Swiss-Prot record:
Organism, scientific name: Mus musculus
Tissues and organs where the protein is expressed, per its UniProt entry: Highly expressed in neurons.
The protein, known as: Gap junction delta-2 protein
Keyword annotations from UniProtKB, A to Z: Cell junction, Cell membrane, Gap junction, Membrane, Transmembrane, Transmembrane helix
Pfam families assigned: Connexin
Purpose of the protein: One gap junction consists of a cluster of closely packed pairs of transmembrane channels, the connexons, through which materials of low MW diffuse from one cell to a neighboring cell.
PROSITE patterns for this protein: CONNEXINS_1 (PS00407), CONNEXINS_2 (PS00408)
Amino acid sequence: MGEWTILERLLEAAVQQHSTMIGRILLTVVVIFRILIVAIVGETVYDDEQTMFVCNTLQPGCNQACYDRAFPISHIRYWVFQIIMVCTPSLCFITYSVHQSAKQRERRYSTVFLALDRDPAESIGGPGGTGGGGSGGSKREDKKLQNAIVNGVLQNTETTSKETEPDCLEVKELTPHPSGLRTAARSKLRRQEGISRFYIIQVVFRNALEIGFLVGQYFLYGFSVPGLYECNRYPCIKEVECYVSRPTEKTVFLVFMFAVSGICVVLNLAELNHLGWRKIKLAVRGAQAKRKSVYEIRNKDLPRVSVPNFGRTQSSDSAYV
C-alpha cells in the first residue's frame, strides 16, 4: 500500500499546478476507483484464484494448464500493469515540469542573467553621455559590481573590500532593469507554452493507453467470468471441467473496471476538447496575425515602383491601330 501512496502523491503534484478541472476529476477517478479498489478489494477477491481453480481430474499438471488457458494474465495483475502504464505519461510530465522550473530558477539567479539585464548604455558612459567623468564612474561601478559578486551571489561591497574570502555572505537586492523584465517575461511565457504543449501530448498518450488496455481487456476476458470452464489442453488426457472460485463477484469487478476505463476515456477526450482544440485555435490565430503583421510591415517599407504596361493599349496614338 505504501507504493500506491507514493504514486498518488506524485499524481497530485502534477495536477495541483498545471491540470484543468477535468484533469482533477480524472485524478479522483484514477486514485479512488482504481488504485484504492485494486489495492484493497482486488487483493481480497483474487487472493485464492489459482488455489481454488479445481478441475475434476487427478492428472498432474492439468489444473495449471487449464488455469493458464482460462486466465492468460490474472485480472489483478493486468489492472496493476494498466495503472502503471496509464500513469507513466503523467510521471513524465512531472519530470519535465520540474526540470523546466529548475532551469528557470538557475537562469534567474545566475550571474550571466544579471549581466545580460544590464543596460549597454550604462556600461559605456551612463545616461549622461560618454564623457570622461561618466566613463570613469562607469568603470568604478563595474569594478564594484565585479567585487560584489562572489560565487555567483551579489555581496555587500563594504565587507568584500575589506575581506578577500568573506565568511558570511550577505545578499543585496538588485533592482531589475526593464529589458531584464521583458527577457524574463518572454522566458516564462516560452516555458509555460512548452509545459502546456507537453501536457496535451501526455493526455493524448494517456488516452491511447486507456483505449488499448480497454480493448485488450475485452479480448482477454470479455464481460463475464464463467463459473464452469471446459478444458482439453495438454497434459489433460480428455476434456475436463474446471470450476472458478467466486465467478459472480469477479464478474461484477470486471464490469466495474470496464466502466472505470470507459469513464477515463471520456474524461480524456473531454479534456482534449477543452484544452487541446482551444490551444490549436489560438496557435492558428496567432500565426495568421503574425503573418499579416509581417506582410504589412514589408509592404510599408518597400517603395512603390510603377510597372510599365507592355500590353496592347486602347489609345488612338498606339502604333497598333
